[in-house]
Design a protein with these regions (language model features):
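Acidic, glycine-rich active-site loops and adjacent beta-strand->loop/helix elements
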Residues: 82-84, 145-153, 175-178, 218, ...
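His/Asp/Glu-rich mid-to-C-terminal helical/loop segments that flank catalytic regions of hydrolases
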Residues: 163, 230-247, 276-279, 325-329, ...
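Acidic/His- and Gly-rich active-site-bordering loop/insert found
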Residues: 9-109
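Active-site metal-coordination/substrate-binding segment of hydrolases
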Residues: 70-152, 157-168, 331-335, 340-341, ...
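Midchain, well-structured core segments that form catalytic/ion-binding scaffolds
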Residues: 108-111, 151-152, 158-371
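Active-site-adjacent substrate-binding region
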Residues: 225-227, 232-255, 395, 407-450
C-alpha cells in the first residue's frame, strides 16, 4: 500500500483515528493519573449507547454486539493501554499534570513539542475508539479492553479478573513496528537469596584496605539485551575475588552491585581487608585479571575496567561463613542465556540475571531475575537457583511471578492474520517474539484459551522527547485492522 500527495491527503480511513488521538492528547494520562482518560473512554462508549464497565483502577471494558450476519463469527478482544510515559527535554516547561500534548506533523511523522507524544499506546487506543463509531465496520462479537499503568508495572493487566473480559481472539495494538507481529513474550519471577550477614572485628595482621570496582560495562535491559551475552559486573567481581582468595588471605568488608531488577549490572564494588605485604602482589594479579576479562568480553564489553584503590583498613569485616556463601552462590549461579527457542529463530527462551547484590541490616540479599517464554523451563531454572541456596544453607524466596505468553505455533489467528497481511502489503509480515514481559502474558493467565497476536504502527524513540509516529503506518495498520476484523473466522 503506497501513498501519494500530501500526508494528510493520504490519511483517509484513519482520519478519525488522528482526531480522537488529538482529543486524548488534551487529557493528562501519565501512569498513575489515568482517571481522566478512563472517564473520557467511558463517556465515549456511553454516547454510543454501548455497554461499558470501569473497574477500581480505571481499566475499561466496552462490549459491542456483532454486526448483522456476523453473530456466529469468533468473538474478538481489542486491547491496548491508555497510560503514557511522561518525559520532557530539560529546558521544557511542560506540566504533564495539566498541559495538553502537542500533535505536530512534519512530513510523514507526528511528534510533540519537546515531550513524549504518547503514541505508545495512545494511537492503538484511538484506533479502538474509532472502530466503535464505525457502523459500517463488519465484525464478530467484540470487546474492547483499555488497561492502565502498563508503563510502570502492568498493574492494569495484573488486575484483570477471570470473566471480566472474554473472547476467542485477542488483538493487542501495542507493537511499535509496522509489519511486525508479536506472537510470544516471556514470563518471569524473582528469587531473593538472603545470606546471614555475620560480622567480626578485622583480624590482626590484616593492616591494609583495597577497593575493587568492576565498571565500564554496557549493562542494558535484562530481557531485550540478554542475548548479547554481556558481562555481569556482580559475577565478574565474584570470579575475581575467588581467584584472589586462592593465593592470598583476605577478608571481605563489603560487596554491592546492580541497581535494578531488569538491568544487567554494569558496576560492582568490593572492599577488602588484606595484609600490607600482599598489596603489591594483589594489584599485579588484578592487572593481569583485567587483561584476561577484557579479552573474554572484548566484543560485548570493550570498556570493561577494574579500578583498584587503597582505602582505610576496615575495622569490621564479614565473617568467613558469610563471605564463603556469598562468593560461592554468585560464582556458581547461572547468569545470562540459559536456553534458546527451537520454534522462533534467535529468540532467547530462558535467561537469568544476577541483578542486585546489597547489604541489609541482617542479611546480604542477592536479587535474581529469571525470564522464560516456556513455563516448564522457567520452573526448572527457578528451582535450580533455589536449590543452590538450599545447598549452601541460606534462605531463598520466590516472588513477583508473571506468566509467559507461550508461542502457539500455527494458531488459526496467526495463520489468518499473516495471510491477510501478505495479501495487502508488499512488505512481508515479520513474526517475532520478545524476551520480556508484555500485557498479553498477564492476560493469557486469565484467558488461557484465547489466541493472541500483537501489531501496531511504527513508533520511533518511545519513552523519550524524540518520540514520533509514522502517519502512513497509522493509515496502513488501521486499514489492515478493519479488514482483519471483517475476515476473521
Amino acid at each position: 500500500m503506497r501513498m501519494k500527495g500530501t500526508i494528510m491527503e493520504t490519511i483517509v480511513q484513519a482520519k478519525r483515528v488522528l482526531e480522537i488521538f488529538k482529543e486524548m492528547s488534551q487529557i493528562p494520562r501519565e501512569s498513575g493519573n489515568e482517571k481522566g482518560i478512563s472517564d473520557y473512554i467511558v463517556n465515549f462508549a456511553k454516547n454510543l449507547g454501548l455497554e461499558v464497565h470501569q473497574d477500581e483502577i480505571f481499566n475499561v471494558v466496552i462490549k459491542k454486539a456483532a454486526s448483522p450476519g456476523y453473530e456466529n463469527r469468533p468473538s474478538i478482544i481489542l486491547q491496548g493501554h491508555i497510560d503514557m510515559v511522561c518525559v520532557k527535554d530539560h529546558d521544557s516547561n511542560h506540566d504533564f499534570s495539566k498541559d495538553p500534548i502537542a500533535n505536530i506533523i512534519e512530513g510523514e511523522w507526528m511528534h510533540a513539542d519537546h515531550t513524549t507524544l504518547g503514541a505508545d499506546n495512545g494511537m492503538g487506543a484511538a484506533m479502538m475508539l474509532a472502530l466503535l463509531e464505525d457502523e459500517s465496520q463488519q465484525h464478530g462479537p467484540m470487546q474492547l479492553l483499555f488497561t492502565t499503568n502498563e508503563e510502570t508495572g502492568m498493574d492494569g493487566a495484573f488486575a484483570i479478573k477471570e470473566g471480566q473480559v472474554t473472547g476467542d481472539y485477542l488483538l493487542n495494538l501495542d507493537t511499535e513496528v509496522e509489519h511486525d507481529f508479536t506472537v510470544s513474550c516471556a514470563g518471569g519471577c524473582h528469587v531473593h537469596v538472603k545470606i546471614p550477614l555475620l560480622r567480626e572485628n578485622n583480624l590482626p595482621g590484616y593492616d591494609a584496605g583495597l577497593s575493587i570496582t568492576v565498571t565500564g560495562l554496557k549493562g542494558g535491559h535484562s530481557g531485550i539485551e540478554i542475548n548479547e551475552q554481556r558481562a555481569n559486573a556482580n559475577q565478574v567481581l565474584t570470579r575475581v575475588l575467588y581467584d584472589i582468595q586462592q593465593q592470598y588471605p583476605i577478608s571481605l568488608a563489603s560487596f554491592e552491585g546492580g541497581v535494578k531488577h531488569n538491568a544487567i549490572p554494569s558496576k560492582a564494588v568490593a572492599v577488602l581487608s588484606v595484609r600490607s605485604e600482599d598489596v603489591a602482589a594483589i594489584k599485579t594479579l588484578l592487572a593481569y585479571q583485567e587483561k584476561q576479562y577484557q579479552h573474554e568480553y572484548s566484543v560485548q564489553d570493550p570498556g570493561l575496567t577494574f579500578v583498584v584503590e587503597d582505602v582505610p583498613t576496615p575495622e569490621i569485616v564479614y565473617a568467613e561463613d558469610t563471605t564463603e556463601a556469598l562468593i560461592t552462590y554468585i560464582y556458581l549461579a547461572q547468569d545470562g542465556v540459559h536456553s534458546v527457542s527451537k520454534s522462533i529463530p534467535n529468540l532467547v527462551e530462558t535467561s537469568n540475571n544476577i541483578a542486585i547484590v546489597r547489604e541489609n541490616q541482617h542479611t546480604i540479599e542477592i536479587l535474581i531475575s529469571i525470564r522464560s517464554s516456556n513455563s516448564n523451563s522457567l520452573e526448572f531454572l527457578t528451582k535450580k537457583m533455589m536449590l543452590l541456596a538450599k545447598a549452601l544453607g541460606v534462605a531463598a524466596e520466590r516472588t513477583g511471578g508473571y506468566p509467559a505468553w507461550e508461542y502457539d505455533k500455527g494458531s488459526k489467528l496467526e495463520e489468518q492474520a499473516i495471510s491477510l497481511h501478505n495479501e495487502m502489503f508488499d512488505t512481508p509480515a515479520n513474526v517475532n517474539a520478545i524476551h520480556a514481559g508484555l500485557e498479553c502474558g498477564l492476560l493469557k493467565g486469565v484467558l488461557p484459551n484465547t489466541q493472541m497476536i500483537s501489531f501496531g504502527p511504527t513508533i520511533v524513540s518511545p519513552h523519550t522527547p524524540s518520540e514520533r509516529v509514522h502517519l502512513p503506518s497509522v493509515e496502513n495498520v488501521y486499514v489492515y485492522l478493519k479488514a482483519l476484523l471483517a475476515k476473521l473466522q
